[in-house]
């Protein structure tokens, strides 16, 4: 399959640094890099224009990076709390997505978009989770997400206390045996 040559206008993870000429599949160029203004086609005119504007683009990138580093210092160790409904076993009814985390960070005066939240898979259980947020392609911070059923429960989790009762504790309190799974009959 044919590949397209592009000049990167900014650092793109797993692809290259600003100014590099890279070859990518046409769909990746057409659907992501070109519309997001992360790259331009590597034509003769674009190469010449990029070389003329390189210093300006590098200065802009440096300014954005420094601003992101200042924000990262200000919010180091940020913890956001999300209150969700969950079963007694701790499974959420629904899940916490990158949009939920971005909204919670926005309330904490950290204006980020959901595309900046690097969440591999949605959070589906109560507890603490560490999520990476890309303030700039070169500046990543860790945000602790505290998912709980109530603000009181969130405080307990933040202190490191267990909120889920163990099955053995439940058995001691109630005298009932917790079922392991469906009984099998022969």
From Swiss-Prot:
UniProt superkingdom: Bacteria
Record GO biological process: translation
Ranges of biased composition (kind: Acidic residues): 168-180
Key word Membrane present: no
Any GO MF annotation of the entry: rRNA binding
This protein's record includes keyword RNA-binding: yes
Stored InterPro entries: Ribosomal_bL9, Ribosomal_bL9/RNase_H1_N, Ribosomal_bL9_bac/chp, Ribosomal_bL9_C, Ribosomal_bL9_C_sf, Ribosomal_bL9_N, Ribosomal_bL9_N_sf
GO cellular component, one term: ribosome
Keywords, sorted A to Z: Ribonucleoprotein, Ribosomal protein, RNA-binding, rRNA-binding
PROSITE patterns: RIBOSOMAL_L9
Record-stated family: Belongs to the bacterial ribosomal protein bL9 family.
Name of protein: Large ribosomal subunit protein bL9
């Amino acid at each position: 399959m044919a590949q397209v040559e592009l000049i990167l206008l900014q650092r793109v993870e797993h692809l290259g640094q600003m100014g590099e000429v890279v070859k990518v599949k046409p769909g990746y160029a057409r659907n992501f890099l070109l519309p997001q203004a992360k790259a331009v086609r590597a034509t003769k005119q674009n190469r010449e224009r990029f070389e003329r504007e390189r210093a300006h683009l590098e200065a802009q990138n440096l300014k954005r990076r420094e601003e992101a580093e200042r924000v990262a210092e200000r919010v180091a160790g940020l913890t956001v709390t999300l209150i969700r409904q969950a079963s007694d076993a701790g499974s959420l009814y629904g899940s916490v997505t990158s949009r939920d985390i971005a909204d919670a960070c926005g309330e904490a005066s950290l204006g980020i978009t959901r595309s900046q939240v690097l969440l591999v898979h949605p959070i589906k259980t109560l507890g603490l989770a560490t999520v990476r947020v890309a303030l700039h392609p070169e500046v990543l911070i860790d945000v602790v997400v505290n998912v709980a059923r109530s603000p009181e429960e969130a405080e307990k989790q933040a202190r490191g206390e267990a909120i889920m009762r163990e099955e053995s504790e439940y058995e001691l309190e109630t005298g009932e045996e917790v079922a392991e799974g469906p009984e099998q009959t022969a």
